Amino acid sequence: MNKILTIIDKEWAEIFKNRLILYTMFLMPLLFTALPLVMLGAMGGQSAGDVTDMPPQFLQLCGELQGTECYQLFMSNQFLLLFMMLPLVIPATIAAYSIVGEKTTRCLEPLLATPISTVELLLGKGLAALIPGVAAGWGSFALFALGAWILVDSPALLARLLDGMWFIAIGVVGPLVALAGISVAIMVSSRVNDPRTAEQITMVLIIPLLGLFFAQIAGVVMVNAGLLWALAGALVLVDVGLVWLGARAFQRETILTKWK
Amino acid sequence: MIQTTNLTKVFGARTAVDALTLTVHEGEVFGFLGPNGAGKTTTVRMLTSLIAPTAGTARINGFEVGRDDTAIRRSVGILTETPGMYDQLSAQKNLTLFARLYEVGDVPGQVEKYLRLLGLWERRNDAVGSFSKGMKQKLAICRALLHEPAVVFLDEPTSGLDPEAARLVREFVAEIKAQGRTIFLCTHNLDEADRLCDRVGVMQQRLLTVDTPTALRRQLYGRKVVFHLREVGAGLPALLQSFPFVKEVEQVENKLLVGLDDPDAQNPVLVRALVQAGADVQFVGELRHSLEDVYLSLIQRGTTE
């Protein structure tokens, strides 16, 4: 455990000196938090308009919410998916730098020469990437909840904005997405020499989430608690496979002798 | 302390290390010489359990490579070819991290001890990225010793250093030798090997030879004594050649180079003979071939065989 904490300590000491990662860690969550709050604030007090423009399935989900409140709920729900992306973007950036970065700074050999096991090393690096990502997701949601509580007058809308679906998305799906991103970053980093390449390839994982985002806007899919649990279940299976593949891809000897 | 038997490493179709059989004794400084690509770093990586041998066995401190890898990593220190420090972190932070990974008992104490020993204590809070190459190398040596390993592997410790920094590193290697540690020194610097090593091994995929630098010189060139004369008279080479113990005589300007087995006993006899023959002997000395001559000769032989 001590070695895992040492790796986390080392990773964070380096992360907090890397401006690019810091910007990703702080600016993106702030942006994702500010946008829905600005939207909620701007729409408050506006006239209802024609709610029939929204996907019919969503109108059903609005339930007792009418007019502007239904619009506010609809728009806020689009950002739910962006909140889920945060735990993917941040760990992917950190993991890509922390693993390939060891190679570019030629620190990997002395590190592997210590009595640390591969599991300890990967756990340390994985947790060092996962914790800030999940913390950023949860922190952003906490800020959003606080902002919504201040900005929204309607108790019915506030209750819908902070209902269980958000907690499933941020608390369960987000960390599972992050774990998938880290596993992919580890796999990619055992094959490439450049942290940016590892980061970019890992970001491909965003595509399914973006697909979900646009599908919801288009009314093809309605994100609800049932869909999120199904997504979480699928992600557990995907994560088990990716963690296993990531650990297998991290071959000490191959990395030492083939990374040039 | 280090014992290998037919240790072999094959990468695809290329044999990097071929049946290396070697023993390095406790407290010895063993120089591992060889050209680039000779398999020196691969050998060190196998002996430090970083990579697995394809065949053969190796034991370090009684632990077997491939079976007791964690114990081996705990008991050896390694200075890799490039220092590989975390440039954004301070010298103290770098060493503290590695001390914790090596499970050192008194982390702050050991870190301070080695930073002071190598004259880096005053710069302990500076980012390693601001250090000179020599300072980084010294810091990497500190890292290799933090857990007080019995065996230390040094891969090109003075490579790329200016003469002053290189001398400091050599002096430090001599110090850790005096502490009784076993040192496995890979180097291209033959002068360094000559000065520091008790024995050297010359490697070119396979081990060409192992011996003390002095014995290697004798093995290849025998012992030669140079007689400096004011003038070499016509009959003098033949006179020396007439002694049964003289192996060969070669004249170079006003010098006679004489091959002998036991110069301590045989020199006085030859000096007496030369003086009696009317030669003015200015001085007598032993011809020393540099380790570089020996090394190049061995490598050339190894290539042609």
Kindly label every feature range from the protein language model.
Chain B
Residues 26, 103, 122, 231, ...:
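Non-catalytic surface loops within mature trypsin-like serine protease
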Residues 128, 254, 287:
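Residue-level "edge-of-site" marker
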Residues 263-305:
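C-terminal coupling/interaction segments
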Residues 106, 122, 247-248, 275, ...:
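Residue-level detector of short coil/turn "hinge" positions at structural boundaries
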Residues 65, 230-232, 263, 287-288:
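Short beta->alpha junction loops/turns
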Residues 2-4, 9-204:
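ABC transporter nucleotide-binding domains
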Residues 170-261:
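ABC transporter nucleotide-binding domain
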